[in-house]
Amino acid sequence: MHTSIVTLNLDAYQNFLANAIFCNLLLTMCLYWFSLIIVNNNLICNLAKFSAVNSNVILFFYLSWRWYNYNFFPLSNLYESLMFLSCLLLFIYQFIEFKTRSRVIGALVLPLIVLVQGFASLSLPTAMQKSSPLVPALQSNWLMLHVSMMMLSYATLLLGSLFSILYLVLYKDKKILTKKSIKEQFVEENFVFQLTTSAFSLNQTSNIITEAKTDRQRLILSLDNWSYRTIGIGFPFLTMGIISGAVWANEAWGSYWSWDPKETWALITWLIFASYLHARLTKGWRGKRAAFLGSFGFFIVWVCYLGVNFLGKGLHSYGFLN
């Protein structure tokens, strides 16, 4: 009886924290868009940033709390991986925002984080939100390495692909840049300086950005460069995740590669982003062509991460649609 009461209290506390995180993220997104489009006020801007940091702290505490209570790294099921992805997206975008001093980054990324968090907290069945004992094959140190590398790659590749999508949107629709506050946030001198002096930037790309004559040119070229750099960071994480997964699979099931649907789509994702980086580095691709390929990668990542997991087949299945 006492154990049942404790379990109910833990479940209620988890639900409260998860709902608080979602509501806080929704508020943060609204504050970002309000400060960007309606009122460019320092108080609202600072409140939005504080709310974002607060969301990340609560989310980090929530994951740490689950780790402490269940005695294994909180990446054992879909719910925890979605929470972990939200935490990574929050941290990475806040780092980029700190470097660029541009609120547009948060306004772009936060809707994605809210959708991820909403899907985890509101759409997944309650049974899928609870931690359960790991099967023997998952009771390995490879769990933390493999899954964390894959989640880091998903977070960075999704952000890089988002920048490519925004590049295409702004390239096609010039009216979006007519709002003064948005234009100022994206093309202020410090933002361009941070992009053009980064160690990840090619000299040729930096010169093109510096020589751009209009705010619009500087904006879309900066987005192109930032997308390239972010994808360039995420690709090694994806590579390490695939390799560590193969080694782990050999230890657990005696085979490095079994053409499981998840493995197949991870390879497809790797090939897409390898093609993107190859085209940029050796073929000189930039602008629309590179952005189309990067944008395509956004959907490929989601298919790899979620799509194949819901089919009910393979070693990585969550069986949600069964």
From Swiss-Prot:
It is found in: Plastid, Chloroplast thylakoid membrane. It comes from the Eukaryota. Keywords: Chloroplast, Cytochrome c-type biogenesis, Membrane, Plastid, Thylakoid, Transmembrane, Transmembrane helix. It is a multi-pass membrane protein. Its main location: plastid. GO terms for cellular component: chloroplast thylakoid membrane; plasma membrane. GO terms for molecular function: heme binding. Disulfide bonds: none annotated. It holds the Pfam family Cytochrom_C_asm. The chain crosses the membrane at residues 19-39, 43-63, 72-92, 104-124, 150-170, 230-250, 264-281, 291-311. InterPro entries: Cyt_c_assembly (IPR002541), Cyt_c_biogenesis_CcsA (IPR017562), Cyt_c_biogenesis_CcsA/CcmC (IPR045062). One of its GO terms (biological process) is cytochrome complex assembly. Required during biogenesis of c-type cytochromes (cytochrome c6 and cytochrome f) at the step of heme attachment. HAMAP family: CytC_CcsA. Belongs to the CcmF/CycK/Ccl1/NrfE/CcsA family. NCBIfam families: cytochr_II_ccsB. May interact with Ccs1. This is Cytochrome c biogenesis protein CcsA. The lineage of its organism: Eukaryota, Sar, Stramenopiles, Ochrophyta, Raphidophyceae.
